[in-house]
A protein has these predicted regions:
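Two-metal-ion RNase H-like nuclease active-site motif
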Residues: 1-26
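Conserved active-site and cofactor/substrate-binding residues in soluble primary-metabolism enzymes
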Residues: 6, 30, 53, 57-61, ...
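Ordered, amphipathic secondary-structure segments that act as subunit-interaction surfaces
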Residues: 67-100, 104
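Charge-biased, low-complexity intrinsically disordered regions
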Residues: 1, 48-50, 59-63, 114-115, ...
Length: 192
């Protein structure tokens, strides 16, 4: 993807803020959930909401937030937010018909994920189904950087590689995710 093409795209980055684990029996804990709309490298808009730690409301919240924008693609910083509150990339793609790119800094270990889901969640099959619907994990290398690991729904890996490389403006992390992370972590620190 030529840099000029990247400058014309509107891409959403999604990231969560941190949280502290509360003792068992405490009220449902929340974490910030941030979506940023970038037009090229320019921040066009952002939204902040809350999702439940280890809940199942992240997909619904994301779909609701995305209905406010016109965009070309969504980049998720993984599929797990606020612990194991999972965004279903297939559901997001089906709702909007736009590619959903899942970006991970480290290679996902789906065996460990499945084991954790089995141990901690009665509804593990629902959560695991989200992982099963994802495509293969691909490695994307940025010059002089450690590789990223990506999965994509709704587009091919060649397009995805070009999008990742074009949107990695100042480091290996694509700018939509990097900006969403800065906002989410900054607001989380401010709230504590």
């Amino acid at each position: 993807m030529h840099l000029n093409a990247w400058q014309e795209l509107r891409v959403v980055g999604v990231e969560d803020g941190g949280f502290f684990r509360e003792p068992s029996g405490s009220a449902a804990q929340k974490a910030l959930f941030v979506c940023v709309l970038l037009h090229g490298n320019w921040i066009e808009d952002f939204q902040v909401d809350e999702i439940t730690v280890d809940g199942l409301d992240a997909s619904k919240k994301l779909v609701s937030m995305l209905h406010h924008w016109a965009f070309h693609a969504v980049m998720l910083a993984g599929v797990s937010f606020a612990g194991f509150n999972l965004v279903d990339p297939t559901l997001v793609f089906e709702e909007f018909g736009k590619p959903v790119v899942i970006v991970s800094r480290t290679k996902p270990d789906n065996v460990a994920v499945k084991n954790a889901l089995l141990r901690h969640f009665e509804d593990w099959q629902i959560r695991w189904g989200i992982f099963e619907r994802l495509g293969p994990i691909h490695e994307v290398s940025i010059i002089n950087e450690v590789p990223l690991y990506v999965e994509v729904v709704g587009e091919d890996i060649e397009w995805t590689n070009e999008l990742i490389r074009a949107s990695a403006a100042c480091c290996r992390i694509p700018e939509p995710i990097r900006v969403a992370r800065l906002i989410a972590r900054g607001l989380t620190r401010k709230a504590r």
